[in-house]
Each structure stands twice: as C-alpha cells, then as structure tokens.
C-alpha cells in the first residue's frame, strides 16, 4: 500500500474503536473499526452502523434525538446538520462531531447508519482546552 497518498484512499487500522471501550466499558468486544486515509488536510468522517435492541426506528426519530442532544445538553460538543456539506465545510469546527442528518439510514427496524463529521485537529484541541478549564475550576 506504499503509493502516492495524495492520490489514493488507503484502508488502515485504527485504535479509536478499541479506545472507546476504555471510556465506555460496556462496549468492550462489541465494536471495532477501520480507518480510510484520504487526501484531505484535516477533516474526517465517522461511518457508524449500529444494531440496536430497540425496534421500529425511523431515520426521522434518530435524527430528532441527535438534534435534541445537539441543541440541548451536548450543545457545543455535538452538532447536527441537514445542509449538503462537504469535508472542507467542517474545517475549524470546534464541536467534536457533527451528525449529517441527510445521510442517516435505518435498515430494517433496528439497524442505524450514521455519518458524522469532525475536524480531527481543532475539535480535539477544543476538548483538551475544556478539560484544562474543568481541572482549573476544581482547583486541581
């Protein structure tokens, strides 16, 4: 796979899926992932497929839940959009992840596919800043 990175999509491994189980132990051995290295400067895209226990899901219902979270308790961390955007539109976005509502799919009654964009440099840096603020607020 050692070819021109600026002209190819390169499948590779990622530790991100396994790292999630360190934060959410209930997900251990329940998820995995891979990465596609693409010739873009900074923005990445999560393609997440979830087999849920809940039946009767709709794309509208899934999107409504993400939108409510993005407008409510996760405001500034999670985003939601129904605009037809591309990777460069998310460059410099401070939110950790922005759900692409136009791409949400429900397969059958219980399988959901979600696409969510993130600026893998700036969004992460903003969360580190949030952590520093939190630690400072506790006097640590």
PLM-predicted stretches and their roles:
Residues 91-140:
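NAD(P)-dependent Rossmann-like dehydrogenase/reductase catalytic/cofactor-binding core
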